[in-house]
């Protein structure tokens, strides 16, 4: 919606269609096709979303129950249906990412807009995580093609990798010693 006084220059020249703003005949088959595609997408979107939420929550549950000293970042349910972000104490996210990549598992340690950066996620810092907590973060993104079997593989590999990295961590060793002394 714009003022009738506003002068809009045509970006496709050659005719007076569309009040001289766009020359040519509308692509009716394309318009109908787009409408049909949108209708189909709307019909299956709820099913896809429910599946992603089910898989997301399943993987969250496995990670929380099977790996000590980790937590879900962000709200449990008010999040994208395909997004998981965890922090793991006593490890560096970059090391975890390299090891996951070697297993064929795609992940990131920050937001999609900062992938490739070695700095901790500014979003995680903004929601109150400490620098070292944000550095030990892992972001996983599911898709409509993700399966429960893949979630099991991811959970098992993350569990093994976290344990292997903690076994090498002097911070984790100090933590375990302090727990024995208490």
Predicted regions and their residues:
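Structural signature of PLP-dependent enzymes
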Residues: 38-61, 71-80
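PLP-dependent aminotransferase class I/II
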Residues: 17-41, 48-55
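PLP-dependent enzyme catalytic core of the Aspartate aminotransferase-like
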Residues: 115, 119-182
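Anionic-ligand binding region
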Residues: 63, 68-99
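A general structural signal for well-ordered alpha-helical segments in protein cores
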Residues: 28-31, 56, 60, 81, ...
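Short, small-residue-biased leader/transition segments that mark boundaries at the very start
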Residues: 1-3
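Flexible, glycine/charged-enriched surface loops at secondary-structure junctions
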Residues: 46-52, 68-75, 110, 165-174
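Conserved C-terminal alpha-helix-loop-beta "cap" of PLP-dependent enzymes
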Residues: 84-139
């Amino acid at each position: 919606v714009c003022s009738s006084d506003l002068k809009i220059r045509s970006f496709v020249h050659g005719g007076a269609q569309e009040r001289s703003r766009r020359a040519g005949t509308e692509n009716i088959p394309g318009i109908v096709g787009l409408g049909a595609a949108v209708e189909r997408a709307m019909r299956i979107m709820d099913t896809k979303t429910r599946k992603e939420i089910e898989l997301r929550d399943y993987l969250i549950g496995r990670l929380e129950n099977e790996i000590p000293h980790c937590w879900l970042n962000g709200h449990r349910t008010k999040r994208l249906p395909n997004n998981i972000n965890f922090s793991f104490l006593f490890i560096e996210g970059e090391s975890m990412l390299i090891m996951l990549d070697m297993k064929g598992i795609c992940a990131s340690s920050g937001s999609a807009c900062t992938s490739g950066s070695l700095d901790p996620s500014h979003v995680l810092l903004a929601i109150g995580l400490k620098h070292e907590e944000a550095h030990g973060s892992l972001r996983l993104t599911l898709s409509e093609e993700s399966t429960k079997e893949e979630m099991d593989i991811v959970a098992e590999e993350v569990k093994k990798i976290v344990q292997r990295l903690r076994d090498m961590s002097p911070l984790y060793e100090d933590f375990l010693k302090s727990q024995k002394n208490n």
